Amino acid sequence: VKRTTVSKFGLLALFSASVVFAQADGGPDGVAMKESDPGIPVTDPLVQEKCGACHALDAKGNMSRISWVRTTPEGWAQVIKRMVRLNGLPITPEESRAVVKSLSASHGLAPQEALPVMYLAEKRTIDETNIPNETMRGACAVCHSFAQPLSWRRSKTEWKSLQDLHVAMYSQADAQYRRPAEDSEQPEGRDPKDKMLRGEYALGYMAKAAPLHTPEWAAWRSRQSVPRLAGEWLVVASAPGQGRFVGAFSVKPGKSADEFVTSSTLKSLTDGSTVSRSGAGIVYAGYSWRGSSKGAAAAGKPDDLASAARETMWFAPDQQSAQGRWYWGDYQEFGLDVKLIRATAAPAVLAVVPGPVKVGTKGAQFRIIGHNMSVSLSASDIDLGAGVTATKIVSARPEELVVTADVAANAPSGQRDVAIGGAVLEKAYPVYSKIDYIKVTPETAVSRLGGIKFPKGYAQFEAIGFENGMDGKQGTADDIAVGPVDVTWSTQEFLAVYYDDDAKYVGALSPAALFTPNVEGPNPERRFGRNNYGDVWVVATAKSEKDKFGKPLSARAYMVVTVPAYQKWDQPEVSQ
């Protein structure tokens, strides 16, 4: 028997051909898998041209597979990349961008569907709280975030096709799907010994949680229109470790109706420094902003606010406000959390400085930052919330009021709204009586070794003070976040392996809580010549706040310092 060597290219060609023939013959992707849901027609000639070779167009304008899925711009960009790699799709970058635009509008998500999973497009590293049980975690959130499938809407047939694709391409997925669904409800009348598998449960769950047709999408299809975002916007922003910012965001029309040119200026509420940025953005589906911008000066350090950044924002359907993240770094670990409000002739309150104020304080000074605020006010016209009385206006400008106020000794702890001349800022600042405990955020973090062949992945921490709520218990929902606390930072060994000395090798933590990881690769100074990876505690010790025993308050977060990301799943082209 003669052996034949098959190259990687040959395998790819064979696999691609099988997909095409299967669709043509009515195989797994063709007519044999009957759709019970009505499809969403594809009317764009470019999409029909680029996708029609494999995805048949029926008499109703539906294209196989495509007409039974909806997703975000990143999702469609991901699909096109996969079609190029696996099936050899011939498409130029310009055509690809046009197809992503088109499908994001005709087969995208409604604003209400996209908002809960915007953190995926915003590249946030968070602990997800939307995973219903361990079965779904094992089936869908072991290899990627749960927001990945929740960023899609599919027919039940398409969810099954996606599951089959995972089994074919990723052996680990097959193993996960075959495990019993231990903590999930089982079908009535089923033998208890014959437990539903994770794959079965996940298929049923996703078909119900993220179906193709939803009331939100039906309503948005008729409302979707050309975004009219040109004009001036007010910005409120914050960056972990760098404080709060206010400023302006100017939007001008670009080359097409959904493209814009931008400029912005942000002013620090901590030290008054300013950062100017310029860039451009694209709006998908009438509300979903993807852009890029950079500062006027070159970035001098990894967390520099002038760094070139990508922008992801969600604009409200009324196009009067937006929220999102402008992020940068090789692992998108740095970023500004931003909120935009359209600037109009009406007054607006944006921020209150310095922020937290203690119960019983007399003559506390507040800087109220805003827009078009009246300068003909008396102290009685300024409402600072329950138990806080404005006593004097020190200075008044349309963009800033400086007032003094007294806080009653019996004022209840909690957030206060500020109201001036019809403008209201909710939860503008907290009133507190004491700081009962502190918390390090994020509570879990990932940093990546680098600096030789691969970039470093940094981590930024903050220490936030809290007062116990009405129940007097720590860590419950009614606790009051007071704000950042002045602390001393350090790292401590996370005791997992004897003599590994992770805290010595993983990297360094600055006084401002910016963690810089060590270099990648074997370290001859370390036992067994291991890499500098490891896990440690990041510890914050308060400089002033103490517990009931007179000891400084302290808290810690868990951090894993791991190897570089040798493969990345990203779609930066949607911001270009």
Spans of model-derived segments:
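Gly/Gly-Pro-rich "capping" loops immediately C-terminal to redox-active cysteine motifs
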Residues: 56-86, 145-171, 276-278, 282-283
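The canonical Cys-X-X-Cys-His
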Residues: 48-58, 99, 136-148
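Edge beta-strand at a domain terminus
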Residues: 215, 223, 308-351, 555-565
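C-terminal capping alpha-helices of c-type cytochrome domains
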Residues: 88-117, 172, 177-220, 224
